[in-house]
């Protein structure tokens, strides 16, 4: 048997006021399943200062206490992309309690060895301001039995806030899942560490053409 048999409930909305967007999401979610145990919440960075209140709203209205997520400069939902406007996307999953655990925030790599981390794979969010993020990802990958990690980096014009039951930043956070949870993934974007400091020598808006007079993808 699998640890989750019901489909995810999900919703998304854009509005100038987060309260209106959150209410719209609740209407889309409908009746909250009694078995909902884990929430996923992604919010535009325009609302980073309100993230504590947004998370508290969804905790109280859904009754779900465990949450993961992040802020981003854009929000992708089912067939919709929100850019340059405040928006949010929320999803609820019905997982057996023993099938997942919220990952504590990991800042220096030694935090990985200090935690009793057990899981088959992990969904994670990383703060790009942490200079040791690659070490954290590799270290966590060595601890999950599949060696498989999915997720992405937080993005923001200000604070790279993440959701890990509460609101925090500065490291790697997420959820560990057991082998009882079925997994299907798609790669939407690949990135590589830039290494030392470079000078952008050619660009078109937000697309970098060359670094230090060399093709950017070299």
Q: Language-model segments: which ranges?
A:
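Small-residue-enriched flexible segments
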Residues: 2-52, 56-66, 70-218
